[in-house]
């Protein structure tokens, strides 16, 4: 229980405790093995429910505990993108392309180039699955005609590419076919980014009406503990989502992702022998 002096003289029962990303996984109702959520903040944090057995990663991910419920432990695979929304902040604050992050969507949609520019936003290195702290940011395909719209679009694209890297690693580690990705966090409000994420991953993106999944997950855990909800099926009834489905041809997706992988290799090679 909590200390009474902090809660209006009442001792409130503590019904659940969870790390922020595990709480978000629960809040996104990823109760089944193979279900995946991704939180889009300054960075991105993707977790996959791998069921009641841990899957030691061989592809640069972290094996972790998701939660314990009714005496059973659920495990997860986790991958982190270091730079996501913070790259949009860089466009806003350092390059002054726009005044609010929300405007980035409008700029991206007005870009003339069709994903020809590639940005590798390794401002603090690259996270999963590379774990390369020495890599520096880079931009490939720039010409005299490259505009702020093109750079904004490419920066948003880079967020989606990095998450594709992690999702592919999860598929390799778990041998689970992933049908959809549940998203939350501030940058998930960007429709351009979510549509391109669906395209580049070739999977359905589900964005719930309430994107504060971390707080929701904590509430679910506490509510289950005190009997506000009696089981997970009751919680599932509360889900309403906006759906994004892939629109891009698979051949085009493969070409774009191959260019991204080439750009990452070049960026990593540039700093490889600096010592």
Segments from the language model and where they lie:
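Acidic/polar loop patches that form or flank catalytic/metal-binding clefts of enzymes
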Residues: 36-39, 89-92, 96-105, 206, ...
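Glycine-rich phosphate-binding/hydrolytic loop that grips phosphoryl groups
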Residues: 24-27, 77, 82, 157, ...
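Alpha-helical scaffold segments in soluble metabolic enzymes
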Residues: 13, 24-27, 86-94, 103-106, ...
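Hydrophobic alpha-helical scaffolding
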Residues: 12-16, 77-81, 93-97, 129, ...
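Short beta-alpha connecting loops at secondary-structure transitions
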Residues: 10, 68-77, 140-141, 151, ...
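ATP-dependent carbohydrate kinase catalytic cores
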Residues: 1-72, 82-86, 99-114, 188-192, ...
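Activation-segment/catalytic-loop signature of the eukaryotic protein kinase fold
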Residues: 113-210, 214-216
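Acidic, glycine/GT-rich loop-and beta-edge segments that sit at the periphery of enzyme/chaperone cores
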Residues: 80, 87, 225-275
């Amino acid at each position: 229980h909590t200390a009474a002096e902090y809660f209006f003289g009442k001792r409130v029962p503590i019904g659940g405790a969870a790390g922020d990303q595990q709480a978000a996984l629960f809040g996104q109702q990823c109760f089944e093995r193979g279900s995946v959520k991704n939180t889009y903040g300054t960075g991105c944090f993707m977790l996959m429910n791998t069921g009641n057995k841990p899957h030691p990663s061989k592809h640069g991910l972290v094996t972790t505990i998701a939660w314990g419920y009714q005496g059973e432990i659920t495990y997860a695979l986790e991958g982190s993108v270091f730079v996501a929304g913070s790259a949009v902040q860089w466009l806003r604050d350092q390059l002054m392309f726009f005044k609010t992050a929300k405007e980035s969507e409008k700029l991206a949609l007005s870009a003339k180039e069709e994903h020809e520019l590639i940005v590798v936003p390794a401002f603090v290195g690259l996270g999963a699955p590379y774990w390369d702290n020495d890599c520096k940011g880079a931009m490939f395909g720039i010409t005299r005609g490259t505009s702020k719209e093109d750079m904004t679009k490419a920066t948003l694209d880079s967020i989606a590419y990095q998450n594709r890297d992690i999702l592919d690693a999860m598929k390799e580690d778990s041998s689970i076919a992933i049908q959809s990705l549940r998203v939350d966090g501030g940058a998930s409000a960007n429709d351009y980014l979510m549509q391109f994420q669906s395209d580049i991953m070739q999977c359905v993106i589900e964005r719930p009406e309430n994107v504060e999944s971390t707080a929701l997950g904590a509430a679910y855990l506490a509510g289950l503990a005190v009997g506000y909800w009696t089981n997970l099926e009751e919680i599932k009834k509360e889900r309403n989502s906006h759906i994004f489905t892939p629109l891009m041809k698979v051949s085009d997706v493969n070409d774009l992702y191959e260019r991204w992988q080439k750009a990452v290799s070049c960026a990593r090679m540039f700093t490889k022998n600096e010592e």
